[in-house]
Amino acid sequence: MRNRVGGSRRQAWSLAVAFVVFTGALTGTAQATPVGPVDLGTLPGDDNSTVLAVNEAGVMVGLSMSGPNPQRKRPVRWDASGQIMALPTPGGTEGQVRDINTHGVSVGYVLTATDAVPTRWDAAGLATTLQVPPGYHNATASAISDTGVAIGNWLTPDNQFHGFRWDPDGQATDLGVLPGETWSMAEGISGDGQIIAGSAMRAGANHAVRWVNGGPITELAPQSWSSGAGRINKAGVTAGSMVETRSGPPIPATWDRDGTIHRLDWPSPHSVWLYHIGSTGYVVGTGYLNAPRRNAVLWDPDGRLTVLADDNLGAEVEAVDAYGTAAGSFQRQATVWYRDGQRTQLGQLPGGSRGQAYRITDSGRVVGTADTSTGKTHAVFWTLR
């Protein structure tokens, strides 16, 4: 799940805007008690595991790991009940799986003795090596659409870093760079595979770009001094930020499917980072509203800002669902923040002391990690509804 579409959006934005602070008090209908965590375990002989992606059916992909130095990472898949399966690594013994689509098809890469090789695994876990043009190398696939279009990044024959895409039939396309430049990165893709979000260099600064229907690279904020917008939901709405002048304040924003920009409330001259955009347009991130303290924050589909309750102790937010439920951590415990103002810390594994939530689905599954009684870190999931 890397996952909007909102109704009306405000056309004007002001640094003087008011924002809401969640106190953690229950202000609406009580939420169901979360169930879990369910320990997803590791492959035999491994120590730790983590979930990197989950689809709406609850199928999860991630890593099973062993050894501190060097650490061996193996791609794995868990079915919705939590049964683990090793994904094959043709030509190597290690690799990573980075994303999974609605149909259970996942992508990542396998590490061979000399190279990173992009790989796709079908819903049954069978591996296919994705072809790379002659001279291109160290290619890693990082996201896949529901239509089977995969994206990632590779090194060109002259060792330049470029974004690329693979069509469902395996045809590879270099996505190119901005005129006169040498670097680009593909970071996310819409559910229909038509819009790819990423970054590229121009005049020594990073710039948010996108590719539509495999077309040429275009800038999302061409008048800005710098920008970045690598978060995209299934509807093709992109989230990121920009700086209009070298010394100007950061401006968080979303871009509609047609490229129309909407500035999000941010009454601060200090840094802000956007981490995830949900399927209906909620956005989460962190930033310094009142430096030096950093806040976990949420924007609704109209761009209104909410500071997530942290009792002035700090919190991290990673993801948000269609209903505005945010997932992350507070006081080293996996935590969700509901739109009615309730903050709920999720359960721990027996004997464990900490946890972290990384993703949340619209169907109510939260995935993350939690410590075991022996100090290992295991992939886990909780159920909200």
Model-inferred region functions:
Residues 31-385:
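Residue-level hotspots at or immediately adjacent to binding/recognition sites across diverse folds
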